[in-house]
C-alpha cells in the first residue's frame, strides 16, 4: 500500500510544478490519470482548478462535484472547502453537482 501511495505522490508532484508555474494544461494532463484512479489529492486539485478557473472555465458546479468526489475518496480539505463553496451556490446548483458526482463515480471517474 505504501508503495502505491509513493507513486501517487510522485505523479501528483509532476502536476504541482507546472500548476505552480501557471501551466494549468500540463498540470491537468498529469493529474487526469490519478483522478481516474481515485486519488483524492488529484481530485481535490482538479476541484480547485474549477473553483479558480485555472486551465478550465470557472464553474462552481464542477468544483463542488469534484470536492464531493475528493471528500468521498478521503480528502479532509475537500470536505472543508465544500462547506465554504456551498455558501456561494443555489440549492439547484448544489443538487446538480451532487447528481454529477454520483454519475461520475458510476463511470469510475472517466469522462466527467
Which residues make up each language-model segment?
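Sec/Tat signal peptide C-region and signal peptidase I cleavage site
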Residues: 3-9
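Hydrophobic face of amphipathic alpha-helices that form TPR/SEL1-like repeat modules
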Residues: 11-18, 33-34, 45-52, 83-85
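The canonical alpha-helical register within tetratricopeptide repeats
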Residues: 33, 62, 69, 84, ...
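Terminal, low-structured helical/coil segments at or just beyond the last alpha-helical repeat
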Residues: 78-112
Amino acid at each position: 500500500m505504501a508503495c502505491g501511495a509513493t507513486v501517487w505522490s510522485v505523479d501528483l508532484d509532476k502536476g504541482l510544478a507546472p500548476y505552480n508555474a501557471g501551466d494549468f494544461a500540463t498540470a491537468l494532463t498529469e493529474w487526469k490519470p490519478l483522478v481516474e484512479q481515485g486519488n483524492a489529492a488529484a481530485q481535490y486539485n482538479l476541484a480547485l482548478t474549477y473553483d479558480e478557473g485555472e486551465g478550465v472555465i470557472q464553474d462552481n458546479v464542477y468544483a463542488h462535484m469534484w470536492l464531493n468526489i475528493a471528500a468521498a475518496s478521503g480528502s479532509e480539505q475537500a470536505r472543508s472547502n465544500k462547506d465554504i463553496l456551498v455558501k456561494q451556490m443555489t440549492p439547484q446548483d448544489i443538487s446538480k453537482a451532487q447528481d454529477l458526482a454520483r454519475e461520475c463515480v458510476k463511470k469510475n471517474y472517466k469522462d466527467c
